[in-house]
Amino acid sequence: MSAVTAFIEYWSRFQDHGVVCVHPDDEQLAKQGDFELTLLPLPINGNLREAEAVILMLNPGLDDEDYEWERNGEYRASLLRNLTQRHGPNDSPLMYLNPKFNQHPGAGYWSRARVPKRAKREQQKLRAIVEALAKRDGVSIESAQAHVAHKVAILQLCPYHSATMGRRDLLNRLPSCLQARKLLHALVESGEKLVVATRSVSEWGFAGPVATESLIVYRSSLGISASLSLASEGGSAILRRLSRCAKNAA
């Protein structure tokens, strides 16, 4: 069994009871942290099998709007399909690039600025890559964004929402975090996907910066901005790794 399949099967054991949203292996320890366990966990955002690039993050964070969005039936259903990696033919696997959810706070962080714009959150980390991909392959911005949504995935070390991650000691104890690290080690060893670690690199287990064809690890001093601009090692590496967009991509 591949590491990707093992990770997906691990999360297939999660059951949505609608009250406490936690993987059964994490149930006791997760309650000790400052996690918002009424929200669905988000260990992976994107299609892990098809992704050509995987971006490592610490945890999904917490926004005041998250609660309202999870009451949106269409969005919650998309979250659950993503959690089980059972994406539909019309899904945008990296959900924050889905035009239907372009007012989600995650969309402003990863994709394009929302209206009204919120400066601290509207970092649009993948926007430069989308625009460069559209120019490189001669397709529309919409087609390029759809391609990135299928070929880039975000892997969280901790799958649970938290504003501050006050109990970082739990990152070395939660079974789901250990599974994420196990997956990371397999991805790095195989080199089949580009892995980009921009933030919390020490928590992921990296001792310092790395720059190879299949692994980019930022210096810890770059962790605050965690830029994926084309001038950054991570952004330029992702663009190089991405396959060409089909001309008729929607």
Label the model's feature ranges.
Residues 1, 249-250:
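C-terminal end-of-chain micro-motif
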Residues 2-190:
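A polyanion-binding, active-site-adjacent surface
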Residues 35, 174-179, 205-227:
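C-terminal/domain-terminus segments
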Residues 45, 107, 207, 222, ...:
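Feature targets compositionally biased, intrinsically disordered low-complexity regions
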Residues 55-59, 192-204:
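Glycine-rich anion-binding loop/nest that anchors nucleotide
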Residues 156-158, 199, 218-223:
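Residues at the C-termini of beta-strands that transition into short coil/loop
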Residues 212-248:
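Short, flexible loop segments at boundaries between secondary-structure elements
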